[in-house]
UniProtKB/Swiss-Prot annotation:
Superkingdom field: Eukaryota
Name of the gene encoding the protein in the UniProt record: RBPJ
Disease: Adams-Oliver syndrome 3: An autosomal dominant form of Adams-Oliver syndrome, a disorder characterized by the congenital absence of skin (aplasia cutis congenita) in combination with transverse limb defects. Aplasia cutis congenita can be located anywhere on the body, but in the vast majority of the cases, it is present on the posterior parietal region where it is often associated with an underlying defect of the parietal bones. Limb abnormalities are typically limb truncation defects affecting the distal phalanges or entire digits (true ectrodactyly).
Protein's cellular compartments: Nucleus; Cytoplasm
Comp. bias (Polar residues): 465-481
Name this protein carries in UniProt: Recombining binding protein suppressor of hairless
Domain IPT/TIG: residue ranges: 355-445
Amino acid sequence: MDHTEGSPAEEPPAHAPSPGKFGERPPPKRLTREAMRNYLKERGDQTVLILHAKVAQKSYGNEKRFFCPPPCVYLMGSGWKKKKEQMERDGCSEQESQPCAFIGIGNSDQEMQQLNLEGKNYCTAKTLYISDSDKRKHFMLSVKMFYGNSDDIGVFLSKRIKVISKPSKKKQSLKNADLCIASGTKVALFNRLRSQTVSTRYLHVEGGNFHASSQQWGAFFIHLLDDDESEGEEFTVRDGYIHYGQTVKLVCSVTGMALPRLIIRKVDKQTALLDADDPVSQLHKCAFYLKDTERMYLCLSQERIIQFQATPCPKEPNKEMINDGASWTIISTDKAEYTFYEGMGPVLAPVTPVPVVESLQLNGGGDVAMLELTGQNFTPNLRVWFGDVEAETMYRCGESMLCVVPDISAFREGWRWVRQPVQVPVTLVRNDGIIYSTSLTFTYTPEPGPRPHCSAAGAILRANSSQVPPNESNTNSEGSYTNASTNSTSVTSSTATVVS
């Protein structure tokens, strides 16, 4: 198998954390309330984002069909800059404090590729592929990160990627739902002139404008609209799979900017088919007609996004002739996001696996209020915190944890019951002080008075867990609790104009 020159083996050598400037680092410390308060005030998180397509086309023989759009790793949050400054204050050189990353397809047969993060917060992996000798039907990208001084950051995995042989030529049916594209999901759009890889450009938003970028790609929500939906910044969306001939709205998942209403049309050679109505499938070529215009299509011209006027086909009224720049390949995209913060300073162990909380479920009420967390990568050394209060926590499995909801008096001194709504962030904390932020909050809502005391919650935990109770428990027999909530978003957008 051909290997990229100079690439390391699939697993770069494991790096043991280097000792501090004046000897070994102190043993790990449990997080204190003061440290949590500082974190909640500053929010100096370090976030690793892995953006990638949901499907990858297999390479046969000696060919290399590079993943398109290329997987991209972003380092987000103010914590990266703060970490670098802290390392340099502690005696590291600029090179030693620089994050390094390698990416691979989780297969020991293929070498990992180094990502160049120097001087910027993102990098794309442009030469990844999966060969037909790899028999997996699904795989995950693996991103190994460490600092220039060899301190380990950890291994971060993408979401699951489906391997396909080639885009479906036959009329797609909803039986292959995993190849169809649902309303409200994210897609990338790219244009490739004369099938040349070097000419590939991606729809992207930068500086408040849509443009065709050769370096970065955007992930856009594709929303299905009613055919009679009028143009506007707010719009009503429909559920279901996207079919050709339907009205859609493309909204940038980062900026919220949107294109005007579009009708998605199937492309055959250099024509847009006006009567196609089958489901849109992965890696199909499609065109976007700007609704209520005179045959105007979304098109690129170098880096600019423009309107292109199609020509009617004289002998075929169901077709319109378009140019190459108006033909877009569509593919579903996904994102893996991992956020962490060293609450008690540098740690010896990698920060991974990073736990991800997907949902919260409140069980019971009053003194027996228990919160169930569902997600991924849970471990027994994690505790749930409500604001700056550590909760008694029970580990169930890698996807489930349970905790006792702290009494309201832990947040409002002297309160015996909830007098006004109090919202607190929910976070997970590892036993060495690593804080894992979630986007979830817990809300205490007002009640007319105290509830009767019941010690069932403590009994449930003690019966099911061998975990040591938290250092600072706040328990009280009265109080009331309500819901756990996520930050939901309504569909509003700012519509961009397309140059004619």
